[in-house]
UniProtKB/Swiss-Prot annotation:
Residues 124-134, 426-453 have a biased composition (Polar residues). SUPFAM superfamilies: ARM repeat. The gene is relch. Keywords: Coiled coil, Endosome, Golgi apparatus, Lipid transport, Repeat, Transport. HEAT repeats lie at residues 574-612, 613-652, 977-1015. It is found in: Recycling endosome; Golgi apparatus, trans-Golgi network. One of its GO terms (biological process) is intracellular cholesterol transport. Disulfide bonds: none annotated. This is RAB11-binding protein RELCH homolog. May regulate intracellular cholesterol transport. It comes from Danio rerio. Residues 404-425 have a biased composition (Low complexity).
């Protein structure tokens, strides 16, 4: 950059960029450095605010190529006489004259000439953040002009100035704004003086450099605390006390430090960034990276003053890049080292193969025939006991390959058999080596590992899905290390070499799972039982409260240990550790025990599986208070059920299933359905107990519940048993397929059509998938094809499992359905879901030929039985809604929908003509109406009733509209519902017209379209005002009942203009009623309606003109007919009169529930006490009592 004619106050952006590019050759910086240039100085302005280029690449020296900035400025002023304020502000900010710029900003604000540059700078808190590290030289020399300033409250003052200036509150007077601005300006000036005082105090409190060096020379001596540090620590300590509820201690602490404001961090000092709280500082004390200065070798005795000037100003990003590069280089070196090891192993193995081949030939010629036969027998084994694969690649038992042993390639077998003789030969030649005892011990233990295989017939897919619930993980680097166990001391050394680099930097940071491979290897190979027990104790107590990932690592290690040492040592060494932790105070440790029981189940002796482990889990399920522990217990019990083969344990398994289903935690019940029940059902299938014991036991318990529930059914237990039956449906269907007559003809062929996606309901877990139970999706496709063909063409002769379902199971469950309470929507819904899943699982052919005929035989919907009410009693039971919603809705084709419509029409007709209760039809409409897909279908059924010739059927259709309106969208209400109701409201039969009133009321309650509301309002008005209805007692009863039900939730205008005036008229007319029975009926309904409406907002005019007069008329009736009601009415009238007299209180409390005073004096006192707590203004108080819409 040319220095002679530079005007620092008049340089364009483009010129600035060009000059920066020219100067960039001297001090080249990376993009990351430029991005963080912001942090070089605590007050350096943001990049967008620089009007000119930096005068030098060194930001701390305001000179241009050796020419001082002042000279450049003078030459610029001489060349251009007028300088803009913005350029002056930019120069002040660039030279770090922050206080001067602050005073200029204040002066300009007072003059009304605010600079956007200064406003943006001083309103940005990021410009006032302190650097993380301050060079010692700066500390010793004091704070210079560009040094950091102690932050005070002036920033908020400037922000408030800006807020006041741009306030849009037009109601304030100009003098008020002037007063506010003067106050803020005065506050800003006081803050400026306080800043200067803080700077002076900070400079005076600095310790002399010689004294500081004396402290540094003695490591035992600590520097005296500085005032700034004391204030910061005081603030953090007080904050900790408040967060942890030590309020009295905090108050005492604040009193003892009355010179400090603990409410505001800025009181500690200007430009001091707030550190984390004490707890975070304590947790991070071991994680903090040492400062760059601390890395200087002490032996060299480097003094900070001797370091280069830019030593402490290097960007943190450069340090990070260096660290990352070093780490990457270490990784590359480690990989190269491993590659070299593998190459050397490859060469050595090739030489060994050649040597072995020659040795084998020599042995065959020279040794005896007995030894030769022994070697051949060893070679002939598919899985040799003394094989010795390559040191680092094959000396491990990998739990990830346990389920894939059948898929080993011929190449692997060949290479394994090739190395057998070498291993045996080496064993004979290494007997004199120092560690031969350890090696022989390891090989002996490996060769003797055999596990008890249960006598079970689970499909591989089901077995693998069951084991997936054992929470093990070998996907990560550490998981792969844990899942492999070394066989010899040489492999241990290799593992130590891999694991120690990860352990050393992490063990102090709660990364203790890195120790698991070392602990397991040592525990496997150590010859002393006490030491092994101690190591396993350390493993289970390694982490105080292990999280999910840490528990998975420990479990993976336990499984690898079990695979290596065998069932005897697992029982003797691992199980005692689990037993010790079973009552641990931390739930995470108990959770580890519960998960370990399931993970170790395949590697335990079968006697232990079915006795000790089962008892441990049963105790934890019954006693543990943590939901997550019981959930893990249930999953482990499911795994145990996949391995248990003792038939005597069936009853214990059944009790465990009931105990799990009755657990109060939803997550435990969910785990029971997902894991335990499918596994238990698979065992019952092998025992032959699924159809003979398990399902009949659940049905018996349901029947017992129904017998005991005459005075109240335990719906929770009914749901528990029925949900268990529902979870058993896939297993039951799998039994049918596996025991079918066509099983001998099953062949996997390519021409079998694939299974439709919607063929089966979505399973709750993989264990409930029929394909998993059977073995594979291809095999299931073949079985389904033969199953449908058998049902459709060949019949069920000899198919015992299917005949049991058709002849025993279905009749019993249908009989149970007929005995449940139809008014219980929960029971109806549960049984509907059960039949829906049953029919979807067993298929459409089974549903049409086996399920529907049994329901149709029971319901008997023929016209001949219309008058025989005794024969149609079943139509009033829950059988109707469950058949309609659980069976007829399984398949959604056109013929299925027609069948459903016809059934509902027949039920509606039969019930209406038989004068039977409509509860079963209502339950059907409620259950189907919850699904919008059936709204059109239900409307079709109701229209059939609207146009029916019988008035009874039309009455039923009118009442069904009330149930349907709430769930139907307003378009259907306008197009289908309202026209049908209008048609019925003009019916010749008065009973049909009366039946439409509840539906009209529900429309007024739920619909928002004004046109619809007006049509309904006109129809209701015709009922009330038409002379032909004046003596219709039933109509008046229905209208009053409807008003009381929908009035509180209806549109306010409808309530005020229609409901309250007509209730007043009805009450007045009831005073002239001569028939006492009718009068008491109307009066009772009016009392209920007025009690419901008293909780609504009622204006003073309505209160005087309609509400109070109606109450007085009603009181007149109650004085003669019901004195106890008259007392309540008198209290209501008195309170309303008080409200009318006191208008102010009436406006504030217009929506107070009048009925609150009727509940009792206690409720009234509580309500008034709440009112007394309100300290808001009248406008806000009015919002509390909003009009209810």
């Amino acid at each position: 950059m040319a220095a002679g004619n530079v005007n620092p106050f008049n340089v364009s952006d483009s010129e600035e960029e060009a000059e920066q590019r020219q100067d960039g050759a001297d001090t080249e910086r990376s993009p990351s450095d430029e991005a963080q240039g912001h942090s070089l100085g605590p007050f350096s302005p943001p990049a967008y605010s620089d009007p000119a280029a930096l005068l030098s690449s060194n930001r701390t020296s305001p000179s241009v190529d050796g020419i001082p900035a002042s000279a450049a400025a003078v030459s610029g002023i001489g060349a251009e006489t007028r300088v803009s304020l913005d350029a002056i502000a930019a120069q002040l900010l660039r030279d770090q004259y922050i206080l001067t710029a602050l005073e200029l900003h204040t002066e300009l604000l007072e003059a009304g000439r605010e600079l956007p540059r200064l406003r943006d700078y001083f309103s940005n808190p990021g410009n006032f953040e302190r650097q993380s590290g301050t060079p010692p030289a700066c500390k010793e020399q004091g704070v210079g002009p560009g040094g950091p300033l102690n932050r005070a409250g002036s920033i908020s003052t400037l922000d408030s100035l800006d807020f006041a200036r741009y306030s849009d509150d037009g109601n304030r007077e100009s003098d008020e704004r002037v007063a506010v601005l003067e106050f803020e300006l005065r506050k800003a000036k006081e803050t400026i003086q306080a800043l200067r005082a803080n700077l002076t105090q900070a400079a005076e409190c600095e310790i002399a450099s010689q004294e500081r060096k004396n402290y540094k020379s003695s490591p035992e001596t600590q520097e005296p605390i500085r005032p700034l540090e004391k204030r910061a620590l005081n603030f953090l300590v007080n904050e900790y006390l408040l967060k942890n509820e030590y309020k009295l201690t905090s108050i005492t602490f604040s009193d003892e430090n009355d010179d400090q404001d603990f409410e505001l961090w800025d009181d500690v000092g200007l430009n001091i960034p707030k550190p984390p709280d004490l707890l975070q500082l304590y947790r991070n004390c071991g994680n903090s990276q040492p400062l760059h200065r601390d890395t200087v070798d002490v032996a060299v005795s480097v003094d900070p003053s001797d370091l280069p000037a830019d030593y402490f100003t290097q960007e943190p990003v450069q340090q990070t890049d260096v660290i990352q590069q070093q780490q990457q280089q270490e990784v590359v070196q480690e990989l190269e080292y491993q590659i070299s090891l593998l190459n050397s192993e490859k060469q050595s193995l090739a030489e060994q193969i050649k040597k072995l081949q020659s040795d084998i030939q020599a042995l065959q010629r020279n040794v005896s025939s007995e030894l030769t036969a022994g070697v051949k027998s060893i070679q002939s084994k598919e899985n040799p006991k003394c094989d010795k694969p390559p040191l680092d690649n094959g000396q491990y038992l990998d739990i990830r390959g346990v389920t894939e042993t059948d898929s080993s390639s011929d190449t692997t077998k060949t290479s394994t058999s090739t190395t057998i003789a070498t291993d045996c030969t080496e064993n004979s030649t290494t007997a004199t080596q120092p560690h031969s005892k350890l090696k022989a011990n390891g090989q002996q233990s490996k060769s003797s590992v055999q596990f008890d295989q249960p006598n079970r017939k689970l499909s591989p897919a089901f077995h693998q899905a069951l084991l997936s619930f054992c929470r093990m993980s070998a996907d990560s680097r550490l998981g792969s290390e844990v899942s492999r166990i070394a066989d010899s001391e040489q492999s241990v050394m290799l593992m130590l070499g891999r694991c120690l680099p990860h352990i050393v930097p992490n063990v102090l940071l709660a990364k203790r799972e890195e120790l698991i491979p070392l602990i397991l290897c040592t525990a496997c190979l150590h010859p002393e039982p006490k030491e092994r027990d101690q190591l396993l104790h350390i493993l289970f107590n390694l982490i105080k409260r292990p999280d999910d990932e840490q528990r998975q690592m420990i479990l993976t290690g336990c499984v690898a240990f079990a695979q290596h040492v065998g069932p005897t040592r697992v029982e003797a060494e691992l199980l005692p550790q689990c037993w010790e932790q079973i009552n641990h105070k931390y739930p995470e440790r108990r959770l580890l025990v519960a998960e370990a029981c399931g993970a170790l189940a395949p590697y335990l002796p079968k006697e232990i599986r079915s006795s000790l482990v089962l008892s441990m889990l049963q105790q934890m399920l019954a006693d543990d208070k943590a939901d997550m522990v019981r959930e893990a217990v249930v999953k482990s019990l499911g795994v145990i059920m996949g391995y248990i083969d003792d038939p005597d344990k069936y009853s214990q398994g059944f009790e465990l299933m009931l105990l799990s289903l009755g657990d109060p935690s939803e997550r435990v019940v969910s785990a029971t359905h997902q894991v335990f029940i499918p596994a238990f059902a698979a065992w019952c299938t092998e025992l032959g107990n699924l159809q003979s014991q398990l399902i009949p036991s659940l049905l018996t318990r349901i029947e017992k519940l129904l017998k005991q529930g005459e005075y109240g059914l335990d719906e929770h237990k009914l749901h528990m048993y029925l949900s268990a039956l529902q979870s058993l449906i896939p297993s039951l269907f799998a039994v049918l397929l596996q025991n079918a007559p066509f099983t001998s003809r099953v062949k996997l062929q390519g021409d079998v059509p694939p299974i439709e996606v919607t063929r089966f309901p979505r399973p709750a877990s993989p264990l409930q998938d029929v394909a998993t139970i059977v073995g594979s999706r291809e095999q299931l496709a073949v079985l389904l094809h033969l199953y449908d063909h058998q049902l459709q063409h060949e019949g069920t002769t000899g198919w015992d499992s299917l005949l049991w379902v058709v002849n025993q199971f279905l009749p019993q469950i249908i009989d149970i359905v007929g005995r449940i309470n139809v008014t219980s929507s929960t029971c109806v819904h549960e049984f509907s879901r059960f039949f829906w899943r049953l029919c979807r699982t067993f298929g459409k052919i089974f549903t049409n030929t086996k399920v529907k005929p049994q329901f149709q035989e029971i319901l008997r919907l023929s016209e001949e039985n219309v008058d025989a009410t005794a024969g149609n009693g079943i139509l009033t039971k829950a059988t109707v809604p469950i058949y309609a919603t659980g069976v007829l809705t399984c398949y959604n084709q056109e013929e299925d929908r027609k069948l459903l419509v016809g059934f509902l029409e027949d039920v509606m007709t039969t019930l209406s003509l038989s004068h039977a209760p409509l509860d079963s039809l209502k339950a059907s409409f409620v259950e189907l109406g919850a699904n919008p897909a059936y709204h059109e279908l239900l409307l079709t059924v109701l229209w059939y009733g609207v146009v029916h010739t019988s008035a009874l059927v039309r009455c039923t259709a009118a009442r069904m509209f009330e149930l349907l309106v709430k769930g139907v969208n307003e378009t259907l209400v306008a197009q289908r519902v309202v026209p049908a109701l209008i048609t019925l409201s003009s019916d010749p039969e008065i009973s049909v017209r009366i039946s439409t009133i509840p539906a009209f009321g529900t429309i007024m309650e739920t619909v928002t379209q004004k046109e619809l509301l007006e049509r309904v309002k006109m129809q209701l008005a015709s009922f009330l005002e038409d002379p032909q209805y004046q003596d219709q007692h039933s109509l008046h009863m229905e209208i009053i009942k409807t008003f009381g039900r929908v009035g509180p939730n209806a549109e306010p205008r409808f309530r005020d203009e229609f409901v309250l005036p007509h209730l007043h008229k009805l009450a007045l007319c009831n005073n002239q009623q001569t028939v006492e029975s009718k009068r008491i009926d109307i009066a009772t309904q009016l009392f209920e309606a007025y009690s419901a409406l008293s909780c609504c907002f009622i204006s003073e005019e309505l209160m005087v003109n309609h509400f109070l007069p109606g109450l007085r008329c009603l009181r007149t009736d109650m004085e003669q007919l019901s004195p106890e009601h008259e007392v309540i009415l008198s209290s209501m009238i008195k309170e309303c009169e008080i409200k009318v007299e006191n208008k102010g209180i009436g406006e504030a409390q217009g929506s107070i529930s009048i009925a609150a005073s009727l509940v009792g004096e206690d409720a009234k006192t509580k309500f008034l006490s709440k009112m007394g707590q309100l300290t808001t203004s009248g406008a806000m108080l009015a919002n509390v009592f909003q009009r209810k819409k």
